[in-house]
Amino acid sequence: MQNSHLSQQRFSDLALHRIVQQAIKEKGFEFCTPIQALSLPITLKGQDIAGQAQTGTGKTIAFLTATFHHLLQKNNINSSEQPRALILAPTRELVVQIANDANFLVQATGLKTGLAYGGEGYDKQLKVIDRGIDILIGTTGRVIDYVKQGIIRLDYIQVVVLDEADRMFDLGFIRDIRYLLRKCPVPQQRLTMLFSATLSYKVRELAFEHMNDPQYVEIEPLQKTGHRIREELFYPSNQDKMALLMTLLEEEWPERCIIFSNTKHRCEEIWGYLSADGHRVGLLTGDVMQKKRLSLLKQFTDGTLDVLVATDVAARGLHIPDVTHVFNYDLPDDCEDYVHRIGRTGRAGESGISISFACEEYAINLPAIEEYIGHSIPVSQYDAKALIEDLPTPHRIKRGAFDSRSNLQRTVKRLKKTY
């Protein structure tokens, strides 16, 4: 980890609970990131906060540190075995990631965490919750399900965290969030924290209805795309697009890269060509079953896979270390998605490379993206005659356990036969 992205604020100088302080030290964290340096002095006093910073800047450790500190400071016995902290995130992958990031604090403090997310693991999640937990980390839908069944009560909540808050609002979870917050003690009786890469005025206005005189802190990047990311743009014809991608992969030979496309079908096509060419590649789209999604992310993180082809489902909130390259096979329709996509590289002080294709179909999105990020993306030329000519016959996706939609279709067919 490079020190260039850290502040001068030492964790040891913060008024942290001694157990949390020791865990932070043993983890090797000495200096705070800017968002941690600004937010922790506020939250450690028990004051609500809305924090805005780019992904990969330490938001998760900021709110986890404050959460564990707050629960230990209260020092009350959780005889109810009901959660005392509620951490909400927009996706199940982010829920799992937050839980993984919290492991070192769990081991140090003895506080117990439980997960609540849809897609799989219902009984497994229930068993953990039934044994009693201190911190519940989940998506809104599954948490509401448990609350309505009487499995979970939120009367004892002392800390609430909304991570990627703007994304939750954008996805239409505002009604769910309001429902859960109203089940918690009033804002004056709890600590509430919001953290996100982007936090619009609309989101803050809505969220502040459920907060107690919050302070707003912002870490403004030098540029929206991050100054450690080298951006490059090509104008390929539709015919050259796949050949250009495969040629660049051979030339760049990235240690670990993510290729983004706008549609599931295009992602499957890219995966098919790269798989046939011998790349260690995974496919992450909305149709991939939850168990497979988590397995793919683990394989990509531990280096079993070198390439991940993804839709924007993977573009927000997921911390995957050491991503060297991001390819925008399609320029996204949403300008913010461009920033979030290339933000997968150049994280935590490291450098990264972003390569985008302004093809015949999606070049129309380029002016709005460049206006949004505040600069033109440097253009590179390519020699069509130098591109890989003999593309392999692409592998086809085998529909089955890999595809949640096909499982649903088979279930429907069985029900029709039964009834």
From Swiss-Prot:
Gene3D superfamilies for this protein: P-loop containing nucleotide triphosphate hydrolases
Enzyme class, UniProt record, top EC level: hydrolase
SMART domains recorded: DEXDc, HELICc
UniProt keyword Nucleotide-binding, yes or no: yes
An example Gene Ontology CC term for this record: cytosol
Keywords on record: ATP-binding, Cytoplasm, Helicase, Hydrolase, Nucleotide-binding, RNA-binding
Entry superkingdom: Bacteria
Motif placement: DEAD box: 163-166
Reactions catalysed, as given in the entry: ATP + H2O = ADP + phosphate + H(+)
Start and end residues of each Helicase C-terminal domain: 241-388
Entry's localization field: Cytoplasm
PROSITE patterns for this protein: DEAD_ATP_HELICASE (PS00039), HELICASE_ATP_BIND_1 (PS51192), HELICASE_CTER (PS51194), Q_MOTIF (PS51195)
Example of a GO biological process term: RNA catabolic process
Span of the annotated motif Q motif: 9-37
Alphabetized GO MF terms: ATP binding; ATP hydrolysis activity; RNA binding; RNA helicase activity
Known EC number: 3.6.4.13
Helicase ATP-binding domain span: 40-217
General function of this protein: DEAD-box RNA helicase involved in RNA degradation. Has RNA-dependent ATPase activity and unwinds double-stranded RNA.
Record-stated family: Belongs to the DEAD box helicase family. RhlB subfamily.
Quaternary structure, from the entry: Component of the RNA degradosome, which is a multiprotein complex involved in RNA processing and mRNA degradation.
Protein name per Swiss-Prot or TrEMBL: ATP-dependent RNA helicase RhlB
